Amino acid sequence: MITSRDVARLAGVSQPTVSRALRGDQRVSEATRERVQRAADALNYVPSETGRSLSTRVTKRIGVVVTDLTNPFYPHLIGPLHDELEQHGYRMMLFTERSETAVASQRLLDRSIDGVVLATATIGSRLPDDLQRRELPFVFLNREAGGRPADAAVVDNELGGRLVARELAELGHRDIAHIGGPAETTTGREREMGFRLGLSEAGIGLPEESVRRGPFDFDTGYRGLTEILAGPTRPTAVFCGNDVIAIGAFNAARAHGVRIPEDLTLIGFDDIPMAAWEAFGLSTVHYDLGELAQEAARLLVRRIESDDDPEPRRTLFTPELVLRATHAAR
């Protein structure tokens, strides 16, 4: 059976472009409509009435997949994302299931929305493939799914990890630990990779016994530092995979009588507003959270409203180190 996917492949466009072209959508250029029609004629393709009725439905709604709203990081993305989408005439719907499988199974993740923002993707995730099969435009925000060419607004996580490693080396630290995020996330993996590479360039090792990993949450930081402090060698510095982990580690240090920064340097990643609170004064890796979210919205709107099928665009934000009160020289 010939499908719109076959027509798209022959015409060199996306499936959504095929649907728009065959219904005479004026957002598609005349040249592209003619190319799609020639491909459809060559394959004797006739769109089904069901498919046509679905493809012509414009809802002006965008689904946003965020699996953990208890993480203080995500509310600081949601506000700017909402505002940018609203400026383009779209309303936002939140999907907050704990697993991507649950999200993918929901009826809402179909043509009842015009596109999807994936803010919690994991490496090897099947959700992007599900969206492609359903011909739903999507964009990665903050995390990617590993190797898939797709629109994305992300941070140069590897560079951020390198910046932390260089700073710690310049401060004279040699016994260093890392409490990172999940290895199945690009954010967790890339930040640790950059950190390891930066330490290696300075001639410093990072033994596996000095590394802990877990969800990007408070408990990972608290538990991770507690375990590291119980080990044979106490570190003088710890790099945490995000600020929430770092705040957990900060509290664990206080509970165990470890002074920050006198006894232990602590550096996070993301620079959420909480990091700047006087209670923490967390040194961390900074990038513009609001602009990251707004760029993801712009990329998705571009994908939805484009005349033709544009090449995937990956916007990479450059981070910088913000030094506050949780770092010191050895």
Where are these regions (language model features)?
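Flexible loop/turn connectors
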Residues: 226-227, 231-330
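Residue-level detector of anion-binding/catalytic polar loops
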Residues: 46, 86-91, 137, 174-175, ...
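Hinge/beta->alpha junction and helix N-cap segments in small-molecule ligand-binding domains
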Residues: 49, 67-76, 94-103, 153-163, ...
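Periplasmic-binding protein-like
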Residues: 113-120, 177-179, 211, 232-242, ...
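Alpha-helical recognition/docking segments in bacterial nutrient-uptake
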Residues: 61-166, 170
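N-terminal helix-turn-helix DNA-binding module of bacterial transcription factors
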Residues: 1-60
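Short beta-strand segments enriched in small/hydrophobic residues
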Residues: 15-20, 55-69, 76, 80, ...
